[in-house]
Amino acid sequence: MGKLSYQSIRREMAWGMASEACCYVYYPEDENDLLEIFELAKARGITVGFRGAGQSYGDASLNGEQILVDLSGWNRILDWDPENGLITVQSGVTIAQLWRRVVSSGW
């Protein structure tokens, strides 16, 4: 699971660099990793916070001394229907990725 173990804590900055927190950071590769992270959090009595692309000015993803799940690697556009303007993406997709995909279709 993940690239950092539970014993590793790391200082994370919000994208706007106005706030920071020390978190146990995990980079899940699949849904099974997510289940394992939730089981770990439940066993330890700690909370889980999520970060998508990590480019929000807010600091909602910071989860001080708790688990931070970094989903920036989950950055695929799964489906795009230009006729209806509906797009399905993973949580790490950026606005720039969305624009590159939809603007050429007139959206």
For the regions a language model picked out, list residue spans one by one.
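Glycine-rich N-terminal segment of FAD-binding domains in flavoprotein oxidoreductases
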Residues: 16-107
